[in-house]
Amino acid sequence: MLNKVCLIVFLFFSIPSFAGDQATMGKTKLTFTIVAPKSLSQEGKQLFLSHAEWMKSTHHHTGPQALLSYDVSEMNELTNPTDLKSKPTGNVIFILSEIYESDAGVEDHFARTPDWKDWPKFDKWLNKCKVTKVSAAKIFNSLTWAGK
């Protein structure tokens, strides 16, 4: 019995040390996946550059509304997403990822959205694309080694 208890205690304390930094566990993640026609990709990129500047100047850096991470990535949509050598479809995929301390950060973000000068253009652009929006997902698993 004591051996089992020791094993459980050892696993409880040692496994996280091999799993990378888990600083985002339990935080709130907003993710938009946008599939845009190639003809709209440059417009999208410009809008995301404006969005990043607005985010930097308006969002909290500490407290329950803190924006902890922000990134936008893009790639050509592929006919076979797991084969990087497959033919492109002619669309571009953008992935917007924002991590907040809590749901309060997402609520604050959406309350501020109308103040972004390019919001009407962004909304119009989104309506021309195929969009999947995940507004406030809880992070339950996280491995982060970036910069280490």
Specify the residue positions occupied by each region the protein language model found.
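Sec-dependent N-terminal signal peptides
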Residues: 5-14
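Alpha-helical transmembrane segments and their immediate juxtamembrane flanks
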Residues: 132-148
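A common structural junction motif
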Residues: 52-56, 114-120
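Boundary at the C-terminal end of the N-terminal hydrophobic targeting segment
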Residues: 19-21
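Short amphipathic alpha-helices within nucleic acid-binding modules
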Residues: 42, 102-112
